[in-house]
């Protein structure tokens, strides 16, 4: 019997190593190899051997500091990797299918070879020889089947890895797109702040010039008063000198010399009076000029304050428009409309008590938890943990200013801490107690500002924004919660 050789393709699969980017299913002719392309570090998420359970907070923060140009370049690189991953996936699937079919063919051959048949007379005569040949054939087919099975299993593993890689790249692309949007928003915010800072500086300069003008006016006014006192004194002395000259005393030796001396003194006083009067007039002119400068400085200050107020109003409008646009882009127009409704209704003074709000929220959340998995909840918690309190407070300041809410810092940290604890432990009451205190002091608009700041501060996902808007809605009324339920299909 001719020797049958097995020419089936070998399948190799190299394990992914930390800090490497796996590219599976690369066809090298006779083998399928799962190779590693280095260069993508700290890529997390999705579990498995690739990169750990999730991307670290430090990595997210580092990427978040990139410029828009860096993020766009990163996007292009990710797109190229995504295309390569799709090609690798298709190749891996094709190889898997081919090797699976080969395994089926070998198994069928083995079954046919092992099928019982009636021995002929010749077969019986050569039973020993036939038994040896049959055993050799059985061993060959068993070996071929084992090899084909291993190849098929390796191909299946390569296919699963290619699919996982494709999904991971898609997740990274979504994350990069979000970071790019946030970076572009940050750049726009910096430009806006620079413009606003110029207007703040204009007010400060105008205030400084007004203060300087007032100081100069006060100095000029003091100088006028001082010179008025001098003029008054010299005028009295002049009057006395005039009286001395007018009263002529004669009949004693040297009276003419005395008279001439008095007349010289009178002339000196007249000259002095003329001089101090001129000085007073000059001081009055300077004072009047300083008054004009103060008036002009007051006008400039008013203009600067008007310009600042106009920018702040525009800034407030732009902030909320940008906020609603962000929600629309990230979560859809219906969510944006709900957010606008909440902001509008927050202008009223009526709101539910902490017990009413908490009961409504818990009922809403229990239904919500059935729709979203623990993985979704962990993702939102990790997203919030990746944002520092100081970063969140910046968003809170903008939204509070846009909604004309003050005093937020006194509650800010308690709300931040209460939200994280609620997500982590499921105990939301401390947060609701803090929010009620805030609403009592500043109105329900404060709750809206506090909670909306979470939406723009972190990539929450649908479960996260549903929780945040649910908290706000529970204070305002059942109508808003019903809208959320309808939107989420729960």
UniProtKB/Swiss-Prot annotation:
Alphabetical list of PROSITE patterns matching this protein: CHANNEL_COLICIN (PS00276)
GO cellular component entries? host cell membrane; membrane
Residue spans with biased composition (Polar residues)? Answer: 1-20
Record region (Disordered)? 1-29, 146-171
| Molecular function (Gene Ontology), one example | pore-forming activity
Give the location in the cell. Answer: Host membrane
DNA repair: is it a keyword of this entry? no
Extent of Basic and acidic residues compositional bias: 146-170
Main localization (coarse) = host cell
Q: Which GO terms describe its biological process?
A: defense response to Gram-negative bacterium; killing of cells of another organism
Give a yes or no for keyword Transmembrane in this entry: yes
Keyword annotations from UniProtKB, A to Z: Antibiotic, Antimicrobial, Bacteriocin, Host membrane, Membrane, Plasmid, Transmembrane, Transmembrane helix
Residue ranges spanning the membrane: these are 447-467
Q: Could you tell me what this protein does?
A: This colicin is a channel-forming colicin. This class of transmembrane toxins depolarize the cytoplasmic membrane, leading to dissipation of cellular energy.
Give the record's family classification: Belongs to the channel forming colicin family.
Know the name of this protein?
Colicin-10
- State the species of origin: Escherichia coli
């Amino acid at each position: 019997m001719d020797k049958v050789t097995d020419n089936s393709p070998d399948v190799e699969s190299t394990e992914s190593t930390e800090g490497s980017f796996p590219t599976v299913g690369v066809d090298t002719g006779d083998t399928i190899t799962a190779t590693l392309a280095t260069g993508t570090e700290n890529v997390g998420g999705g579990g498995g051997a690739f990169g750990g359970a999730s991307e670290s907070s430090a990595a997210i923060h580092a990427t978040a500091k990139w410029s828009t140009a860096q993020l766009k370049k990163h996007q292009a690189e990710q797109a190229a990797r995504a295309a390569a991953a799709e090609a690798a996936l298709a190749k891996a699937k094709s190889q898997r299918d081919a090797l699976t079919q080969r395994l089926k063919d070998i198994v069928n051959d083995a079954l046919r070879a092992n099928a019982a048949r009636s021995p002929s007379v010749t077969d019986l005569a050569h039973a020993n020889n036939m038994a040896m040949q049959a055993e050799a054939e059985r061993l060959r087919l068993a070996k071929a089947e084992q090899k084909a099975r291993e190849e098929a299993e390796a191909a299946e593993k390569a296919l699963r890895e290619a699919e996982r890689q494709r999904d991971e790249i898609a997740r990274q692309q979504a994350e990069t797109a979000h970071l790019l949007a946030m970076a572009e928003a940050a750049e726009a915010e910096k430009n806006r702040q620079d413009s606003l800072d110029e207007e703040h500086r204009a007010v400060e300069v105008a205030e400084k010039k007004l203060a300087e003008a007032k100081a100069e006016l006060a100095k000029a006014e003091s100088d006028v008063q001082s010179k008025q006192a001098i003029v008054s004194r010299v005028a009295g002395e002049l009057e006395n000198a005039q009286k001395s000259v007018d009263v002529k005393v004669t009949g004693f030796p040297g009276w003419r010399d005395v008279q001439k001396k008095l007349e010289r003194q009178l002339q000196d006083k007249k000259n002095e009076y003329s001089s101090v009067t001129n000085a007073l007039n000059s001081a009055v002119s300077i004072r009047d000029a300083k008054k004009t400068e103060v008036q002009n400085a007051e006008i400039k200050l008013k203009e600067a304050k008007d310009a600042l107020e106009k920018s702040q109003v525009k800034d407030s409008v732009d902030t909320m428009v940008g906020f609603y646009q962000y929600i629309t882009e990230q979560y859809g127009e219906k969510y944006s409309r709900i957010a606008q409704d909440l902001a509008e209704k927050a202008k009223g003074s009526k709101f539910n008590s902490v017990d009413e709000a908490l009961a409504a929220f818990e009922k809403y959340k229990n239904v919500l938890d059935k729709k979203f998995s623990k993985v979704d909840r962990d993702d939102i918690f990790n997203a919030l943990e990746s944002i520092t309190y100081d970063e969140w407070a910046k968003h809170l300041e903008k939204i509070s200013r846009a909604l004309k809410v003050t005093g937020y810092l006194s509650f800010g940290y308690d709300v931040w801490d209460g939200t994280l604890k609620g997500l982590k432990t499921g105990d939301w009451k401390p947060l609701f107690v803090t929010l009620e205190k805030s609403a009592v002091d500043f109105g329900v608009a404060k709750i809206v500002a506090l909670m909306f700041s979470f939406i723009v501060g972190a990539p929450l996902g649908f479960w996260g924004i549903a929780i945040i808007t649910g908290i706000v809605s529970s204070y305002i009324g059942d109508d808003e919660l019903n809208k959320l339920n309808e939107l989420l299909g729960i």
